[in-house]
Amino acid sequence: MSLQSNSVKPTEIPLSEIRRPLAPVLDPQKIDAMVATMKGIPTASKTCSLEQAEAAASAGELPPVDVLGVRVKGQTLYYAFGGCHRLQAYDRRARETQNAAFPVRCRVLPATPRQIRMYLGSSLDIE
């Protein structure tokens, strides 16, 4: 959650609809802890205390991922530039449950194609 998305209501988006254009640098132990927490087994990691993990496990969910929603040709494209560990944890749960449309808690911030190009460059053709 960021300052920009703090007031945005969380929604669920299928994992398969979230584009992750940047290669992440991941800590496998952190992902393991998040997956365990999603399963209701609170697990601490380097960046999450046991108390925080217990709160997430009792809620049965991870904090929402900020995504940018871009309207193009009548459909919304979702781009995630952060939340890499949470998205990997959702990806692992999706594979475990064999559900490519596994729901991801997100806060969607509206964006324009021009704004997305600032992140990805002119090679992106979304108009």
UniProtKB/Swiss-Prot annotation:
Q: Where are the transmembrane segments?
A: none
Compartments annotated for it: namely: Cytoplasm; Nucleus
Q: List UniProt keywords, sorted A-Z.
A: Antioxidant, ATP-binding, Cytoplasm, Disulfide bond, Magnesium, Nucleotide-binding, Nucleus, Oxidoreductase
Any one GO MF term held by the record is: sulfiredoxin activity
Q: How is it modified after translation?
A: Forms a transient disulfide bond with TSA1 during the reduction of cysteine sulfinic acid (-SO2H).
Resulting phenotype, C106S: No effect on formation of disulfide bond with TSA1 and reduction of cysteine-sulfinic acid
One Pfam annotation reads ParBc
* Record keyword Disulfide bond present: yes
Result after altering C48S: Minor effect on formation of disulfide bond with TSA1 and reduction of cysteine-sulfinic acid
| Regulation: induction | By hydrogen peroxide.
Give GO BP annotations, semicolon-separated.
cellular response to oxidative stress; negative regulation of protein polymerization
Substrates-to-products reaction catalysed: S-hydroxy-S-oxy-L-cysteinyl-[peroxiredoxin] + [protein]-dithiol + ATP = S-hydroxy-L-cysteinyl-[peroxiredoxin] + [protein]-disulfide + ADP + phosphate
Top EC class of this enzyme: oxidoreductase
Effect of changing C84S: reported as:
Abolishes formation of disulfide bond with TSA1 and reduction of cysteine-sulfinic acid
Q: Which GO terms describe its cellular component?
A: cytoplasm; nucleus
Q: What does this protein do?
A: Contributes to oxidative stress resistance by reducing cysteine-sulfinic acid formed under exposure to oxidants in the peroxiredoxin TSA1. May catalyze the reduction in a multi-step process by acting both as a specific phosphotransferase and as thioltransferase.
* Identification of the protein by name: Sulfiredoxin
Gene name of this polypeptide: SRX1
